Amino acid sequence: MSATTETQTEKLTFRIYKDGEPQKFKRLQDNIFQASWSHKCPTYVQSTPPCQGSCPSGEDIRGYLNIVRGVEKPPVGADGKPVMPWQEYAWRRLTEANPLPAVMGRVCPAPCETGCNRNMVEDHVGINSVEHFLGEYAIANNLQFNKPSKLTGKKVAVLGGGPAGLSVAYQLSLKGHSVTIFDDHEFLGGMMRYGIPGYRTPRDVLDAEIQRILNLGVEVKLKCRVGTDISMDQINKDFDAVFLGLGAQGGRPLPVEGTENVSNIVTATSFLKAFNDGRLKHVGKRVVVVGGGDTSIDVATVARRLGHITTSKPTDWEGAIAGQMAQDVADISMRQGADVILTSVFPVDKMMASKPEIDHAQAEGIDIMGGWMPVAVIKDANNRATALRVCQCEAKMVGGRLEIKKIDGSEKDLPADLIVSAIGQSIDFTGLEVFNNGKGAISTDKAYAVQGKPGVYAGGDVIRPHLLTTAIGHGAIAADGIDQFLLGVEAGRRPKIDVHVFDLMRKLAEKGTTIGRISEPLCGTDTSKAAVHNYDNRSDRYVIAHDELFLGHFQYTPRNKRHITHLNKESALGNFEERLDPLDDKQVVGEAKRCMSCGLCFECDNCVVYCPQTAVYKVKKTESTTGRYVATDYDKCIGCHICRDVCPTGYIQMGLGE
């Protein structure tokens, strides 16, 4: 969940030019133009905003924010009225990349918000909260995806029904291919269902978004594992292509000796699965979690909510986690708080978990010990762990590898009834060993094609355990590769900036204002009727930075924040209610208006108002659309660069003529 607690209260001022240091005189002189000799005239350059460049799913974030704020309008019908509400239009733009916005709007750590240029003004745009709102709107209004007009007759097997598998199934179905998902669980969802607690991803929300994908005609075979229940050879015979979205639902044991066959030392994945299956309803009085990422936070907060039962036996929770039994639901009326400690080799401020989740965990009474590592397990005569011995350490990443240095003499024992290892995940390759690259993962190229296996693609945690949004992005890119393979088309090179972006040509066609034949090499001209006047799309190779914007245009505007139910040590016990409420219509529009539309015109009129030669003018309404709002009369333009200086979004660049 992205719910940053920090607020920028200092109002800032901005300058385009800084005091000139000697080494910068030449560069600054280059920006001083005179009417008699300047040859630099404005061109309109579409760039990718850093929010989209930071989004692993590749969402057109700027696009749906511009729709929500009213800059980009839905298409109109013959009666002159919009064919759909702005909420639906924004949702459809969002779901071109991500079919699970209601889920991701709740649990995604939102790297897009970290990259947001608005951070240089006062605070990031609440992108995650807008996504949450649109996902909720779609469920409430039963919005469905549009089925393809025709089918290709090609069949694709998707192994695994987690975020990667659902993403590729969705994208392939839209392309007209028949998809069958094989999953060895009772329900689809992968880690969204069996890893993340239900109070973070409500099951009715998850079910609704999964069902919408299945409504495209996707077939499902549950409790069926390829490699054991059905052979890979049979899959290859029955299907034209295969996607491996196996996930990484196995846990990694503690990296200390003596943990084998110790019943009260478990992995995070088995702990969370037992909880999400409904088998685990209480734990021991003292729980120690070893980790530092978001999964370890989930384990710790679940343990805090479950609490312990004084009359229970250790075998009760151990058997539930092992899948051997389910605890008696009647016992939960007697639950008491559990003491939960979470250890991490990194200091708390450098932990991999998102800061808001760390803050919530600490508020709920979880003791987070940063800079500690496990060194030994203390066991009794029955081979049960009674404590975890830890010592202080210094950890850092060197060349992509974790290096940990123990601090001698700092050891201490943490008494524990249950120890949970949340230090990583592993992949079960049973029956599919041929795909194991020897490092417990699958090797692919940049299009996620499995090396040496034509027609086989992979994505998600089988490549590298990462975020849910990363798995969704893998699925979308793999779907493009599978589609090209099935159609016999040679796979093209993926763009440098591989995300969904605003498509001006599509928007012109949508409005019915396409001028002649579209020809990319001519897009920068002002004479050809087959091109858009002085426009260049560099979205596939360029992310625009904050120092290319006119930040002084943007007034200090606090972020519209979602309401979060904050729990303490007492109120967390037994509380499994969702704690995050979506924004309402007014709030979400207000939040979208904070977007600076980096790299694309948002129709502020600054360039028209401030041009001293009236060279910049508005395009006729019958020919204009988003991204084609203004143009330049080069017979009047003197190259003074004022239009560029006052362009808030960095859409205008003084490059034409160079």
Describe the role of every protein-language-model region.
Residues M1-K155, R203, V242-N261, T269, ...:
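Ferredoxin-type iron-sulfur electron-transfer modules and their immediate structural context
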Residues R27, E59-P82, W91-R93, M120, ...:
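Beta1-alpha1 glycine-rich phosphate/pyrophosphate-binding loop at the start
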Residues V158-F182, L222-S231, G250, S270-K355, ...:
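Rossmann-like dinucleotide/flavin-binding elements
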Residues G217, F239, V262, G284-K285, ...:
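Short, well-ordered alpha-helix to beta-strand connector turns
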Residues L222-N236, G371-N383, E394-A395:
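A conserved short coil-to-beta-strand element within the FAD-binding core of flavoproteins
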Residues P253-E257, G399-K406, T430-F435:
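Glycine/threonine-rich flexible loop motifs
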